Amino acid sequence: MVNILPFHKNNRHSAGVVTCADDVSGDGSGGDTKKEEDVVQVTESPSSGSRNNHRSDNEKDDAIRMEKISKNQSASSNGTIREDLIMDVDLEKSPSVDGDSEPHKLKQGLQSRHVQLIALGGAIGTGLLVGTSSTLHTCGPAGLFISYIIISAVIYPIMCALGEMVCFLPGDGSDSAGSTANLVTRYVDPSLGFATGWNYFYCYVILVAAECTAASGVVEYWTTAVPKGVWITIFLCVVVILNFSAVKVYGESEFWFASIKILCIVGLIILSFILFWGGGPNHDRLGFRYWQHPGAFAHHLTGGSLGNFTDIYTGIIKGAFAFILGPELVCMTSAECADQRRNIAKASRRFVWRLIFFYVLGTLAISVIVPYNDPTLVNALAQGKPGAGSSPFVIGIQNAGIKVLPHIINGCILTSAWSAANAFMFASTRSLLTMAQTGQAPKCLGRINKWGVPYVAVGVSFLCSCLAYLNVSSSTADVFNWFSNISTISGFLGWMCGCIAYLRFRKAIFYNGLYDRLPFKTWGQPYTVWFSLIVIGIITITNGYAIFIPKYWRVADFIAAYITLPIFLVLWFGHKLYTRTWRQWWLPVSEIDVTTGLVEIEEKSREIEEMRLPPTGFKDKFLDALL
């Protein structure tokens, strides 16, 4: 067997070490076998000496890990290895050659159940539970439903593409390898990665502000006695405290927040199904009544077939806010979760069920319980009513004669907004961390404490998210719409860059003959990614099409629709000029690094898999399949 250790990305012929193993000899009877390993130094890379110096330390760590896991395998009741043992041992600080301790790393404190629940509900916030009211009113039930199907079809290939790249090289805890900016820097171009990183950062902090703004409005459903600024302060402080804590605290909080959101949405879908068949207190069988009267499409711009098309297209632009950060959040956890390849692959595969069940079925449920011209809905949107006051689910439930449930749903909306803000804060800090580690942001932002928290990045993200205080002097609806519009286009640009990174990654994989070593492969690539890239590119350019109709022209809407594009281009071209790399707009395939760290992660994954015991019994098999 021949293993080629990582080589430098700028020289395909500077590979460091070639190992030849498994030379088998024995007598004719097949008795003893002899395994020899010859190590041949071909050309020493700068990092090979460091590997040799640390070999004894690494062997010692491996021995400790094997001993701890063997002692505790019997304690695992579901037949799988203990993830907490892996994370506790792998990322312990070991002494360096000169006696100093190594820099602190991110801790792999996220277990399988954390990653799976984050994948299912981590980024679901007010966009689905409240934001759909505006889309329903503007586009009609069919426009809402069809647009969410199209967005889901566009998003899933992106999730698969990011999952493939991150599962291949998930990082070792010293960086946030799963961030889209890091992938773009590594596989496309550092300048484009620079623009992508800062684009994502201000997208994330704006989303933190947007969700905290929405959460403050949700509380106003119950009382207006307390000023908005007080609620914003409370929500921001709780989010910051959770992100200043160890990552396992974040994972645990998101696990329970996501569980509440999932149970809430499942309950609302079931209740909508009951109302569909007339099971409410008034026994009014709804069916698809509202698809016929007032109609399936709202025709907000024009009538006929063109009106149907514009309703769907507007629904895509408006509805995309509910999907922002969904794929990225799953991959950003890769450097901080145990058994990285297995957990990220599982989360990526199951992402489709989140799209189908929550978004597609959720919007179908909304479309059958509320007409797009419902007086309560129209009045709530006109007055900017917060929280449950403008939620289409709540309006439909109230129309059915159910009294108490709206308050419960408002509580779920509050936890959803809070949870989404928590997730966006996590993403913003990891985005800053990645840029600091790749030289695209001040190095101080990359400082990590002994608990594995990038504390400087958390502090900076908190300061930027104080944009939420703009809500104190403006209505919740106006500020929320501004934030959502700007962050949605930033999300579009990030998705496009992720698609480009995957296409370059795929070329490099085939160039180096590594396709068979991909641990996670998805159907239809690269064609599905090309589909997503083209669709998102068209939407990004035309997202403000309606404002060019004279009667809809507003300068504020034009700025919100297109301000992100020049900012992104200035970041990209400015970095090119600053680094004087304008002659090369993307890395040649021969220079794309798809090998550094590959052997190590493959060996680690193989060790984990060999120690994994298959689940026994129905309960263990069910939990293994679920989480």
Curated annotation (Swiss-Prot):
Indicate yes or no for the key word Membrane: yes
According to its UniProt entry, what is the function of this protein?
Answer: Required for high-affinity proline transport. May be responsible for proline recognition and probably also for proline translocation across the plasma membrane. Also functions as a non-specific GABA permease. Can also transport alanine and glycine.
UniProt membrane topology term: Multi-pass membrane protein
Q: Where is the composition biased (Basic and acidic residues)?
A: 54-70
GO cellular component annotations, sorted alphabetically? membrane; plasma membrane
This one is known as Proline-specific permease
| Glycan attachment points | N72, N78
Upregulating conditions:
Requires the presence of GABA.
Q: Which Gene3D superfamilies match?
A: Amino acid/polyamine transporter I
| Domain of life where this protein originates | Eukaryota
The UniProt keyword set, sorted, is:
Amino-acid transport, Glycoprotein, Membrane, Transmembrane, Transmembrane helix, Transport
The biological processes this protein is annotated with in GO are: amino acid transmembrane transport; gamma-aminobutyric acid transport; neutral amino acid transport; proline transport
Q: Where in the cell is it found?
A: Membrane
**One Pfam match, by short name?**
AA_permease
**What parts of the sequence cross the membrane?**
115-136, 142-162, 191-210, 229-247, 262-281, 306-326, 351-370, 408-427, 455-473, 483-503, 522-542, 558-578
Give the InterPro entries listed for this entry. AA-permease/SLC12A_dom (IPR004841), Amino_acid_permease_CS (IPR004840), Amino_acid_permease_fungi (IPR004762), APC_YAT (IPR050524)
Principal subcellular localisation of the protein: membrane
* Protein family: Belongs to the amino acid-polyamine-organocation (APC) superfamily. YAT (TC 2.A.3.10) family.
A GO MF term: L-proline transmembrane transporter activity
